[in-house]
Amino acid sequence: MTLSHAQTPLVFIVSGPSGSGKSTLVQKMLEVPGTMFSVSCTTRPPRATESAGKWYDFVSEDEFERRVQSGDFLEHARVFGKHQYGTPRRWLDEAQCKGLDLVLEIDVQGAEQVKQKLPHAVAIFILPPAKEELERRLRARGQDSEEAIKRRLERAEQEIRRYTAYDFLVVNDDMDRAGREIQAITIAARCLRSCLSQRAHNILESFGG
């Protein structure tokens, strides 16, 4: 499904701390017809459950820097002072050509860059219900050391402090409900005046106005 030719495709930004459930909620968004996912580029190594090209393209530091210098990224940032992440511009071009809404799963640094370049992008922040629950989820994943969990919790606080920069907040205390909420946001955002102004103009013209 593509959007109406008179409807402007949207860019959705989804951010949230590690363990907030944002990746699962992004999958819920992609169940809404007319959406596509922006595959991020990163210098970090793939995890055991990850395959290249689905959620991330994995590249070397040299390759990432080459792409930065070439202006290939809509946004890019170094996370935890370690690995780099970036959103290739080609996904935005492809979404616009296909008439699809584009979903970006990016951190708060990247979100700020995108909002500066695309002020009408719809930004959604995923909140955990509490610090204790976030810590429980991080431990349950079994992927991180104690030091890494501590760093993630510290970063989570820093990220949550920036929630006011976002248009919508989803508290993920129940995945089913949070999934319905983020799908509702995806659909409702398409009814924004900024998205439908051209269509409204065309309708008005049909009256001879």
What are these regions (language model features)?
Residues 2-3, 184-209:
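C-terminal accessory "lid"/substrate-recognition subdomains
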Residues 1-11:
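Extreme N-terminal, non-catalytic leader segments
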Residues 30-40, 61:
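Post-Walker A helix-loop "phosphate-sensing" segment adjacent to the P-loop in P-loop NTPases
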Residues 22:
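Conserved lysine of the Walker
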Residues 25-26:
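Post-Walker A alpha-helix
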Residues 15-17:
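P-loop (Walker A) phosphate-binding loop of NTP-binding proteins
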Residues 44-49, 72, 96-101, 112-168, ...:
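A glycine- and Lys/Arg-enriched "phosphate-lid" helix/loop adjacent to the NTP-binding pocket
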Residues 42-102, 109-112:
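ATP-dependent small-molecule kinase phosphotransfer cores
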